[in-house]
Swiss-Prot record:
One of the essential components for the initiation of protein synthesis. Protects formylmethionyl-tRNA from spontaneous hydrolysis and promotes its binding to the 30S ribosomal subunits. Also involved in the hydrolysis of GTP during the formation of the 70S ribosomal complex. Residues 458-461 are annotated as: G3. Residues 548-550 are annotated as: G5. The keyword NADP does not apply. This is Translation initiation factor IF-2. Keywords: Cytoplasm, GTP-binding, Initiation factor, Nucleotide-binding, Protein biosynthesis. Residues 512-515 are annotated as: G4. GO terms for cellular component: cytosol. Disulfide bonds: none annotated. PROSITE patterns: G_TR_2 (PS51722), IF2 (PS01176). SUPFAM superfamilies: Initiation factor IF2/eIF5b, domain 3, P-loop containing nucleoside triphosphate hydrolases, Putative DNA-binding domain, Translation proteins. Residues 411-418 are annotated as: G1.
Amino acid sequence: MTIQSFAIEVQMSVDYLIQQFLDIGITKTKFDFITQSEKEILFRHMNVNKIAVFNKLFLQRKTHSTLNVSSTNGKSKKVKVEVRKKRVYMVPCSIRKSHVSNNTNILLVENDNSKDKYKSDDCNELSELVACDENKISSNENQVMCFISQKEKLDHFTIRQDYVRTNELVKDVNQDLDHQIRDRKGLSNSVCCDVLLNVQDEQHDDNNFSCGLSDDMAVSNNIPEHDKQKLENVRKNLTDRLRSTRTRNLSKLVKQNKHNNSKVCMIYESDKDEKLYVLPSSRVYKNKRKQSILVQSFNKPMQKTVRDVVIGETISVAELSNKMSIKSSSMIKMMMKLGLMVTINQNLDQETAQLVVEEMGHNAILRRENALEELIMHDNNNDYQNISSKLDNAKNDMGYKNRAPIVTIMGHVDHGKTSLLDYIRSTNVASSESGGITQNIGAYCVQLANNDMVTFIDTPGHEAFTDMRARGIQLTDIVVLVVAADDGVMPQTVEAIQYIRDGNLPVIIAINKIDKSVTNVERIKNELNSYGFIPEEWGGHTQFVNVSAVSGEGVNDLLDSILVQSEILELKSMHHGLAKAVVIESSLDRSRGPVVTVLVRSGELKCGDIVLCGTEYGRVRAMRDSLGFDVIKAGPSIPVELLGLSGIPGTGEWLVVVNNEKKAREVALYRKEKKREIKLARKSEKTIIENFNSMDIIKIKELNFIIKSDTQGSMEVICESLKKLSTNKMVMKILSASIGNVTETDAVLALSSHSRILAFNVKVDLSAKNIIELNHINIQYYSVIYSLLDEVKELISSTIAPQVDFKVIGIAKVHNIFQSPRYGTIAGCMVTQGVIKLHKQIKIVRNGIIMYKGVLDSLRHFKNDVSEVKIGVECGIGIKNYSDVCSGDIIEVLDKI
């Protein structure tokens, strides 16, 4: 039988069984065989270990309490205390020895039968005497050995020579008892030797210590009455001598450990389990549990600890001091020596923190906050390169191959961009758009008659959608600039031309609406020629195509021009591997959740892929193409609508496929936290500027808005347009901007902040509708963006108070000053210009400085009250609440324009 099968039979692990064989001196492996004799030796060894364990019983008990500790600031602090008690119950020596004596008696009887010359009664008498003496000796020795064993358990104390003397004392007493036993009974040495061997064997089996018995001892179960008193006296004398010796040793230990500021715990009596705590004051207390809890043993480290401090891109002074386990005040002092004035909550950059850590003698470990993000992108690049190398080595045509061109249609509003795209796609999108204009960016994939694929991106033409047009330019390969034949070059046309120049993109000019009667194509060519677009028939390199979105004239020529241009560009991309895509538009659907429209740039996007997009992540649950059909995968230049993200990403964000969802979630959370920090930093900067503005005399008014939109792009456009409407006297403050219907939370926020709700192509939930109607909250619904902007402009003009301008209608110079009991100070003036009228606004100017603005209170001419005084006439002017008028001052009289 092998060790492995034997372990299964005895229900033990193979490692434990091999260890047991090693303990008895037999080396085995799990494939070795085992004999019957080796089994018996193993079982005997395991039984002995069990007996050794059963001789002791350990009891542990835990008590929980609360301790009130006063702190430096006067407040008490509660500390939870757990007291653990351990009590050991050992089998008394008399019980074990009785077991030994029983076995020994059996051996004596066998000896007596074999040797007739010894009498059984003599052996019994000797065994009784030996048992009595042995019990007494073992009891005393047990006390000493228990004391020594407990001392050996203490880590920072060793057994000293005093205890060795105590052991010698015990041996002397044992020898005296041995001589008494020899004198009482004189038996043959051979019988005593047999008894001694049996006793020692039993003691070895019980894992007990040697009792130091002499060779001529025998064992018995009964103790004679006349020997009890004498042996008891011997035990008492031994106990007294031991106690006196321990007291002397204890005083020596106290003197030696007086300066250690620690406690000495010693176990004296095994049956009582008392603890003596020796404090630095050399006083002995029994069971001082509170002192044992509060007074701790702590040794000050002699060497300075060098720590590894991990430093991010930014770290506060308090956090850095905690990592180095030093006080913040000490760290601030050290930084002041370096010439840095900081506070405890101030953030430090990575270089400064590294300098401080190295100055303190620790090791600085620099960590980039975006390390995980870089790791994911690096893994994606490695996978992409591996796939490319494999395909190149295999010379497979499925690697890099031609992709469909991405064509962006741009132009001024109402020049027919969407209508032209509808004719190409054989759809009617323009008729379903609100206001007849495009307000969202759209991507469509069109399959031509020759099975070639072209992806079109339709951009809005309104001036408010500047950012949306810029995003469309970043994705495109070819630009089709649509210009109406009856309208010519307009502002948004010029803007598109600027984008084309910045991106150095190939362009095709499509002159639309040539089916109208009033057209002037040559004028349009001349206008575009001034911007550097020279037609091919004029010797240039720009293609001009005349088209009509209504009749379809010239549309095929336009498509042919696009295909020719794409062949010249040789557009290729990887069609396998992890996909990369860019977000074109995103929205929130009540039944489907976040819906994201993406354009795949490289790789292959499949259902079930784990994706990371900005601050959001998720798994692709479903995909639809531009026609609304479900698809399983999408290649380069294919726009798809996917579901499964955790939230709504921003337009223009890159979507990448990753291998690990956990890492994707961590990167998304990191990006979200970083975005929040940037937002808070900008908010704090705005708060500082607002505090400075609040110091001005003129109060700046605010209009609070809550914006709800159907798509992410429309929401961004509305926010940017409202911010552009802010003036020095009126600020557009957007409290909340989100996607989806107006909810109860939006209504409550509008009620508490006195805000207006602007709902763009969205509805109101029933719960929010009740709150809005009950509290008369101002909410406006819009479907066209320029209607929204026009109404906001009217609101601003009605809110701002009309500006009042004044003009000077008369000037008077002060010649004399008079005092009147009724009117106070009266200025005697000569009118030098214009007319001075009563109750008009006036300014008092002294040496070119305006001293006072107020109202003309009284006007007299030769003690007669008059309403006006003309040029060249003297008059007296009384000014309300102002008496500091001097001779030579100029008084200007103002009137509203």
